[in-house]
Structures are given as C-alpha cells and as structure tokens.
Curated annotation (Swiss-Prot):
Gene: CHCHD7
Sequence motif: Cx9C motif 2, positions: 37-47
Cysteine pairs bridged by disulfides in the record: C16-C47, C26-C37
SUPFAM superfamilies per UniProt: Cysteine alpha-hairpin motif
Name the record gives this protein: Coiled-coil-helix-coiled-coil-helix domain-containing protein 7
Organism: Bos taurus (Bovine)
Annotated spans, Disordered: 1-20, 61-85
Amino acid sequence: MPMVTRRLRDPDVNPCLSESDASTRCMAENNYDKESCSSHFLKYKNCRKFWNSVMIQRRQNGVKPPMPTAAERDEILGGLGKMPY
C-alpha cells in the first residue's frame, strides 16, 4: 500500500475515515449512482468542514498538533453530546 494511502487510512490523520468508507461503500452497493448516496456525501463534507474549523482554531491558539488525535477527537465529540455533522 503506498505511503499516501496508508496515511489516509490512519484514524489519527483522517478524522472522517468512517464517513469516507460509508460513502465509498454506498457507491459500490448502488452501482455508482451518486444521487442514491448524496446523504453520505453530505455527511462526509460536513465532517471535513467541522474538523477543518477545529484545526484552524487550534492553529490560531498555538495548539500542537493542529489536528487532534483520534483520542482527543473522541473527547471533543463526547463533550458536545452529539455529532455536530
């Protein structure tokens, strides 16, 4: 597996791994009909938007690393009480 692919499959690097997998699985199950999977695409897009805003805020506050680890993301989502996307 190429290095870039391995990085994207790493839960510490990609916060929207489950949403990405769900949209890919939906496309495969629905014979690549994009309209059938639009809800999955929207959830993935909102996930990326949410974690990007978290990353920008952490950069502005000087927090390293800018992207929270998988454990930190679980704490953030737990503190919110529900999925923000």
